[in-house]
Amino acid sequence: AVNPTGCDAVEPVAVRALDLINKGRDGYLFQLLRVADAHLDKVESIAVYYLVESDCPVLSRKHWDDCELNVTVIGQCKLAGPEDLSVNDFNCTTSSVSSALTNMRARGGEGTSYFLDFSVRNCSSHHFPRHHIFGFCRADLFYDVEASDLETPKDIVTNCEVFHRRFSAVQHHLGRPFHSGEHEHSPAGRPPFKPSGSKDHGHPHESYNFRCPPPLEHKNHSDSPPFQARAPLPFPPPGLRCPHPPFGTKGNHRPPHDHSSDEHHPHGHHPHGHHPHGHHPHGHHPPDNDFYDHGPCDPPPHRPPPRHSKERGPGKGHFRFHWRPTGYIHRLPSLKKGEVLPLPEANFPSFSLPNHNNPLQPEIQAFPQSASESCPGTFNIKFLHISKFFAYTLPK
């Protein structure tokens, strides 16, 4: 039976589980801030944990204990897995919080600066192939004293972490000095900088620094395709590759011929279709990706039904099964002041294939809906300033 257990007591298990999730991630990696809820299903010496975790990302392929943290994006995960250090399934939600922390106007003797945080996306309705991207950006805008024209800042510095299915956390830095007497001419009279993520059409003084993350160890990425998408922020030239195909928590590659570029939104809803204090609805998911990060683009047309695979078992002929990916991470738009990050749904499949390596392992049960009395656990004291973005209690 699935019973509540102590959050602080299972923290080492949660840390190991996040390490497994991070092995399949490119770009943002998760660090444990707190175990928010925990349940345990124990049969003899076999245990399956059901965890709700609050996480903080870092931008490095190193182990997160060795990284310097820059808290701009937070996340929460629900996961289920046995104590033999494998993760059966998980769902996560992430969102940028720096807008709620750092959006401000600073005035000095020589000028006025604005510090903004915003998310960018490519949801073009044009007829060329759509390659969905999503990213979080931080922009610093500087104006002369008492400047009334907000469309022509004297200087703009923008840093973005942009996510694309063919690239891993490509970091973009845009510096745009505006010299005396110089003006930016925006298309259709629109301002040159839009926090909503409008397209940038280039400027002679722009400088771009493109960086691919370090390669994953012991993995062959020689077949990675070049980048070919059009995006709202500048991307690496076509010859630059960031060859990091993601890996699953069980060590398996993504299918090698994944041509899907559609993003999926469960039930056809926008990620913020529900109040931020409620659950985030997650229904069916695309069948042809392992770790698939969902950005806030409009839902695509209905996808064809999932493919079926046929396997031959020893002496049992053919049987059919659905290939299902392990784990989903859903990116939500930036949080505003007073909002909390919605929890993901734990819509894990009601069935589980038998574990031939450990036949005594109990089947994965429905994720517990009630909160454990000895939870949540202790919040990481270094990051108490972002604890307000997490709900302290689960819905009863």
UniProtKB/Swiss-Prot annotation:
Residues 266-284, 304-322 have a biased composition (Basic residues). Residues 233-246 have a biased composition (Pro residues). Residues 176-322 are annotated as: Disordered. Glycans are attached at N70, N91, N122, N220. Residues 1-102, 103-169 form the Cystatin domain. One of its GO terms (cellular component) is extracellular region. Disulfide bonds join C7-C375, C56-C67, C77-C92, C123-C297, C137-C160, C212-C242. Coiled coil: none annotated. It is found in: Secreted. One of its GO terms (molecular function) is heme binding. InterPro entries: Cystatin_sf, Kininogen_Fetuin_HRG. Residues 197-208, 255-265, 285-296 have a biased composition (Basic and acidic residues). Its main location: secreted. N-glycosylated. Keywords: Blood coagulation, Copper, Disulfide bond, Fibrinolysis, Glycoprotein, Hemostasis, Heparin-binding, Phosphoprotein, Repeat, Secreted, Zinc. SUPFAM superfamilies: Cystatin/monellin. Gene3D superfamilies: 3.10.450.10. The record marks R230, A231 as: Cleavage. Plasma glycoprotein that binds a number of ligands such as heme, heparin, heparan sulfate, thrombospondin, plasminogen, and divalent metal ions. Inhibits rosette formation. Acts as an adapter protein and implicated in regulating many processes such as immune complex and pathogen clearance, cell adhesion, angiogenesis, coagulation and fibrinolysis. Mediates clearance of necrotic cells through enhancing the phagocytosis of necrotic cells in a heparan sulfate-dependent pathway. This process can be regulated by the presence of certain HRG ligands such as heparin and zinc ions. Interacts (via the HRR domain) with TPM1; the interaction appears to contribute to the antiangiogenic properties of the HRR domain. Interacts with THBS1 (via the TSP type I repeats); the interaction blocks the antiangiogenic effect of THBS1 with CD36. Interacts with PLG (via its Kringle domains); the interaction tethers PLG to the cell surface and enhances its activation. Interacts with THBS2; the interaction blocks the antiangiogenic effect of THBS2 with CD36. This is Histidine-rich glycoprotein. The gene is HRG.
